[in-house]
Amino acid sequence: MAPDPVAAETAAQGPTPRYFTWDEVAQRSGCEERWLVIDRKVYNISEFTRRHPGGSRVISHYAGQDATDPFVAFHINKGLVKKYMNSLLIGELSPEQPSFEPTKNKELTDEFRELRATVERMGLMKANHVFFLLYLLHILLLDGAAWLTLWVFGTSFLPFLLCAVLLSAVQAQAGWLQHDFGHLSVFSTSKWNHLLHHFVIGHLKGAPASWWNHMHFQHHAKPNCFRKDPDINMHPFFFALGKILSVELGKQKKKYMPYNHQHKYFFLIGPPALLPLYFQWYIFYFVIQRKKWVDLAWMITFYVRFFLTYVPLLGLKAFLGLFFIVRFLESNWFVWVTQMNHIPMHIDHDRNMDWVSTQLQATCNVHKSAFNDWFSGHLNFQIEHHLFPTMPRHNYHKVAPLVQSLCAKHGIEYQSKPLLSAFADIIHSLKESGQLWLDAYLHQ
């Protein structure tokens, strides 16, 4: 039987703390009971998951596991957070128990924690506010230039097209900037990060911050882990992803789509369709279904501003055409950039590996250049971003050599490639996994 939470908490804080083994912790990973370990302390999060500020699922994905490194990675004020966690404390690991499970590489984990301490001493977790101010200003300038294009040159085809391209750049770049605020990587307090996150994602993009938090934090916690990373939820209903999952799907004789042709239909239902045909409508369902009225209010300000700005110039019909062309262009930009770092990498069920191995097997980089940095919002440094999600993006290139050294020492592949090669690898990986599915479907 599980220990009584009140009694266990009292025992944990008294002179004789309650001790647990990893087997006991691992058993508490289901819907009824959820425990996790941080710095050898055992916490009962069964009731807390619904109140977790980062979302119920992201913390639940570590139920029954050690969560020390993700805890450090995601929180910017760990001391304050730990005070709130005291009410969840039920004991600690027995002295003879290792600090984390045998599936995790101890030497690699210890050295990564030393690297993190070095990074903090170097000041690489501190943001340059001028960088982010200039980044916001460049987005606002592009936004203004889009409107001025129609106002000055009229609404004929070429000005209309240029306006659409500029607005798609605004949307893409605002997407990268909201990502910075969402990860708490700009300000030292959560309050200001959250406020600017609402402004950028809500007012400049028309999307809800709560939806982004709910989806994106899960992705970072368990990247490319089936049923834990929502970014690969298109498996199996639209695509067969990864070698392991594709073969598994084929052996089960499941066929929701002709996966052996997925590298072809990706161009139809992937980049052009994700935002205008799915996200555009789902975000409203999300905020209304979950009663996220603050998010909805921020979103409405975007649509009101966009409507009042462009309808007087274009009329309603052309305005709607402009809106969906922008969403179409933005969708292509967004999908190619976000998928190039993950789809070609290892995709599997959660194997409860250490933090570094979890992130490195699921991510790759794209070579640094001024264009690549701007075009991808510095997500060409995906490895560094995943290891240090609250690090300001302008410091990724500074920590990259240290990460490469750590990977080389432990025989971990650190992948970095040209931008076009990264795009091509998406198609190559889809073709390969589709063929693996077909072979397993027909012959195994």
Curated annotation (Swiss-Prot):
Q: What are the record's GO terms for cellular component?
A: endoplasmic reticulum membrane; intracellular membrane-bounded organelle; membrane; mitochondrion
In-chain residues carrying the UniProt-annotated modification N-acetylmethionine: M1
Q: Which reaction does it catalyse?
A: (8Z,11Z,14Z)-eicosatrienoyl-CoA + 2 Fe(II)-[cytochrome b5] + O2 + 2 H(+) = (5Z,8Z,11Z,14Z)-eicosatetraenoyl-CoA + 2 Fe(III)-[cytochrome b5] + 2 H2O; (8Z,11Z,14Z,17Z)-eicosatetraenoyl-CoA + 2 Fe(II)-[cytochrome b5] + O2 + 2 H(+) = (5Z,8Z,11Z,14Z,17Z)-eicosapentaenoyl-CoA + 2 Fe(III)-[cytochrome b5] + 2 H2O; (11E)-octadecenoyl-CoA + 2 Fe(II)-[cytochrome b5] + O2 + 2 H(+) = (5Z,11E)-octadecadienoyl-CoA + 2 Fe(III)-[cytochrome b5] + 2 H2O
Q: What is its EC number?
A: 1.14.19.44
Give the transmembrane region(s).
122-142, 146-170, 268-288, 306-326
The entry's keywords: Acetylation, Electron transport, Endoplasmic reticulum, Fatty acid biosynthesis, Fatty acid metabolism, Lipid biosynthesis, Lipid metabolism, Membrane, Mitochondrion, Oxidoreductase, Transmembrane, Transmembrane helix, Transport
Entry superkingdom:
Eukaryota
Q: In which pathway does it act?
A: Lipid metabolism; polyunsaturated fatty acid biosynthesis
The conditions that induce or repress this protein are given as:
Strongly down-regulated upon differentiation in a neuroblastoma cell line (at protein level).
State the InterPro entries in the record.
Cyt_B5-like_heme/steroid-bd, Cyt_B5-like_heme/steroid_sf, FA_desaturase_dom, Fatty_acid_desaturase
Cytoplasmic topological domain residue ranges: 1-121, 171-267, 327-444
Q: Where is this motif: Histidine box-1?
A: 179-183
Q: Which residues form the Cytochrome b5 heme-binding domain?
A: 17-94
Gene Ontology BP terms: alpha-linolenic acid metabolic process; cell-cell signaling; cellular response to starvation; icosanoid biosynthetic process; linoleic acid metabolic process; lipid metabolic process; long-chain fatty acid biosynthetic process; phospholipid biosynthetic process
Short name of one Pfam family: FA_desaturase
User: Which GO molecular function, any one, fits this protein according to its record?
Assistant: oxidoreductase activity, acting on paired donors, with oxidation of a pair of donors resulting in the reduction of molecular oxygen to two molecules of water
Matching entries from Gene3D superfamilies are given as: Cytochrome b5-like heme/steroid binding domain
Tissue specificity here reads: Widely expressed, with highest levels in liver, brain, adrenal gland and heart. Highly expressed in fetal liver and brain.
Lumenal topological domain ranges are 143-145, 289-305
In which residues does the motif Histidine box-2 occur?
A: 216-220
Return the motif ranges for Histidine box-3: 382-386
Q: Which CDD domains match?
A: Delta6-FADS-like
Description of its domains: The histidine box domains may contain the active site and/or be involved in metal ion binding.
Family membership: Belongs to the fatty acid desaturase type 1 family.
Could you tell me what this protein is called?
Acyl-CoA (8-3)-desaturase
